[in-house]
Amino acid sequence: MAAKDIRFGEDARTRMVRGVNVLANAVKATLGPKGRNVVLEKSFGAPTITKDGVSVAKEIELADKFENMGAQMVKEVASKTNDNAGDGTTTATVLAQALIREGAKAVAAGMNPMDLKRGIDQAVKAAVVELKNISKPTTDDKAIAQVGTISANSDESIGNIIAEAMKKVGKEGVITVEEGSGLENELDVVEGMQFDRGYLSPYFINNQQSQSADLDDPFILLHDKKISNVRDLLPVLEGVAKAGKPLLIVAEEVEGEALATLVVNTIRGIVKVVAVKAPGFGDRRKAMLEDMAVLTGGTVISEEVGLALEKATIKDLGRAKKVQVSKENTTIIDGAGDTAAIESRVGQIKTQIEDTSSDYDREKLQERVAKLAGGVAVIKVGASTEIEMKEKKARVEDALHATRAAVEEGVVPGGGVALVRALVAVGELKGANEDQTHGIQIALRAMEAPLREIVANAGEEPSVILNKVKEGSGNYGYNAANGEFGDMVEFGILDPTKVTRSALQNAASIAGLMITTEAMVADAPKKDEPAMPAGGGMGGMGGMDF
């Protein structure tokens, strides 16, 4: 086992705070409408230019192991806030730095770290309650656009496109962000349920212009096994042919004789059929087939529930107004499923989302909710260079998370004003002893830090602006973009309540851990082995020229 280097007490805390300051100073430069850019070196290709706090934090590793531990703990604040609320990483870092710096000073002055932590926790609890009281629900598109604009570093085009996407696919709909091919941002909306499987044979194409198979008012057969024997399909095919409607078959696989017969029937015009593979794999495939069954009002033909394909009738099939099948995608539009059944299924999936700990599973479950609840919107980000594209895409993703958070818990006045207004509730608190009361004072000062930093980045005097904001009430604050004072809501400067709350809670959590740290352990630096001595020349080689 490698030897360890151990630091105690004041020495440990000083090094840790030094690391915190290095990371926080780099990150907080990006805060506010006049935040500065940070340039990140890449191992290959051009450097990345960003105003995204979490991107800066992720890049930072310090040479000193003890300083690096401090930096990594604050990085955790940024990424945890990003995971919870999707934004607010820079605010969380600024709050954490302020709490840790003041807390470390108090511990150095001989105060009890545990009492300081209790005081900070008490203050944060009161501030969170006050934030919820100030919060207003987000209902209209304008507020959603404003939140998106602020989160995207005051880019109105991003705020507007997100609001439009939410309007089209609903609050539950999935909105994905992709790199576009043009200079402008574009919005593509897929209505209904789309999955990434196309037709199994090009002979199913009936729309030569779009190279797709379009079915109007079709029946939909859902089967969780392979279909290779055409005899199994005959009862369903006969029923569909009598009804004079087209048929979409979604199965694990359609092959051999069965596929050949379907192609021949389609070409001859006896019955219009399109066969596609079921999406997903394993349990996820079964779940998605069940989703389709609920959406279309059909039944999944599965031997697990005692249904054999040869016994299936037209009553077991789902219906939809339209189905479009391209080479790569299938879209079911306006399924005939019962609304109550769809809502119940959505509720069931939402419960699974709450229970899962895997980010990947959560994302896939959210996609399923969206496909059942309304549709999928794709924002294609446009830019003139690859560097700009990456930076803009990161901002769009941030703004999207922020708007979702705003819809979830409402909004508060932005620009650091909400935390300043929450000071009133915290200022009335008293601790059980002097050290706890000092902990409350530390939290009070830290809650002013985001506004101070926004003002400093805009090139103004933080104390002067802060005092003027404190003299006002309600939504009154400072618009750093144009240097005006006024109603932040009217200016359209809003922050999601969830973002501000998460930033404060996560910052206090890490600050509490750091203040109460008494020892740090890291691997001792390895001493370089002495190099081998140079070898002598071979005998008998004297006088030779090389």
Swiss-Prot record:
Signal peptide: none annotated. InterPro entries: Chaperonin_Cpn60_CS, Cpn60/GroEL, Cpn60/GroEL/TCP-1, GroEL-like_apical_dom_sf, GROEL-like_equatorial_sf, TCP-1-like_intermed_sf. It catalyses: ATP + H2O + a folded polypeptide = ADP + phosphate + an unfolded polypeptide. Together with its co-chaperonin GroES, plays an essential role in assisting protein folding. The GroEL-GroES system forms a nano-cage that allows encapsulation of the non-native substrate proteins and provides a physical environment optimized to promote and accelerate protein folding. ATP binds at residues 30-33, 51, 87-91, 415, 479-481, 495. Disulfide bonds: none annotated. GO terms for molecular function: ATP binding; ATP-dependent protein folding chaperone; isomerase activity; unfolded protein binding. SUPFAM superfamilies: GroEL apical domain-like (SSF52029), GroEL equatorial domain-like (SSF48592), GroEL-intermediate domain like (SSF54849). It comes from Xanthomonas euvesicatoria pv. vesicatoria (strain 85-10) (Xanthomonas campestris pv. vesicatoria). Belongs to the chaperonin (HSP60) family. GO terms for cellular component: cytoplasm. GO terms for biological process: protein refolding. Residues 534-546 have a biased composition (Gly residues). Gene3D superfamilies: GroEL, GroEL-like equatorial domain, TCP-1-like chaperonin intermediate domain. Residues 526-546 are annotated as: Disordered. Forms a cylinder of 14 subunits composed of two heptameric rings stacked back-to-back. Interacts with the co-chaperonin GroES. Its EC number is 5.6.1.7. This is Chaperonin GroEL. It is an enzyme of class 5 (isomerase).
